[in-house]
Amino acid sequence: MPIPAKISFMNNEPFASPGRDRPSPLPSCLPGPLPGRLLGIDAGGGATRVVLVAGGEVVRRQVAPPMNALLTEDVSERLLGLVTGWDATAAGIGLPGLRSPAARARLAAELTRRADRPVHVTGDGETALLGAFGARPGIAVFAGTGSGATGWDGRRWARAGGHGFLLGDEGSAYWIGRAAVNAALRWEDGMGGSAALRDAVVQASGSDLAALVAEVHAHPAERQLLSRLAPVITDLAGQDETARYIAERAAVHLAALAQAVRAELGPLPVCGLGGVLAAPVIWHRFTELTGAARPLAPPEIGAALLAWRGGREEAGGCRGLEATHEDGGD
């Protein structure tokens, strides 16, 4: 599968984001100033992050509403608006929920035609991996609103998880928030949980449990109703046994994603990214289980790398990324 052969990570400095419109240098993951202005779009269940890269710097960034190919109406129109709204010569997009290589190719062709510039589309796992490792083999475990893992050993791709909130997303913010509400309900029913966790859930949700349950059932696809409660667990884990247990289980689930990909590809290095893994209580346990490191650059930078590499490929772009495997997580 073609990966940018000339990208090299010269050091281990983390990617810094000093401000929305303040230029910031990239980590040493690009081969000097690149031609053109490259747009990177990382869509996700919590937000869509966009960067414009020119001359080895991020010259502009934006946070847009969440986007998922399975859950978002008019996703092609929304992406077209982002692509045409920026002064970019090429764009790369990591989009969750785009199930088939053929669907990715169709969307890329449509956006390329309508935006009148090259647009390359892949899953969000692949752009996460590009940002985390560049040209190097590795495994990226992502845990935001959803969860999943993508790996590349230099020849083969593998993935685990990413099946969406109805059938998977273990260890994600949605999974943690659902576990928090479940524990609060169990306490009210006299079946476990804790009063401290129940009180924290009620305070964070801004309503009593009955109203929260009714809202979740009325709007089951609104994943933020539960995923926004994940900090209840990470904040309480140091003092509350139930919260600590949920955080531990989340870390174990995320580590299992990495181990599943390692079982297929071998003992590759692991990077962890996403808001859930930013919580120290989960990150520390996850690293104990996997030896993971932080990524050198975020997924939106990986999407910009996709835009660059796609422009260097003959006859149709970065096919190794645009047609690798099915994707369903974010």
Residue ranges and their predicted role:
Residues 2-87, 132-139, 181-330:
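ATP-binding/phosphotransfer module of carbohydrate and carboxylate kinases, centering on a glycine-rich
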Residues 40, 122, 142:
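Generic enzyme active-site microenvironment
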Residues 92-99, 143-146, 267-278:
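Glycine-rich beta-strand-to-loop/alpha-helix junction loops that act as flexible
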Residues 105, 145-159, 230, 279-289:
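Acidic-glycine-rich active-site phosphate/pyrophosphate-binding loop
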Residues 111-118, 157-164, 286-291:
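Glycine/charged-rich beta-loop-alpha catalytic/anionic-binding loops adjacent to active sites
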Residues 122-123, 297:
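Short loop/edge segments at beta-strand edges and connector loops
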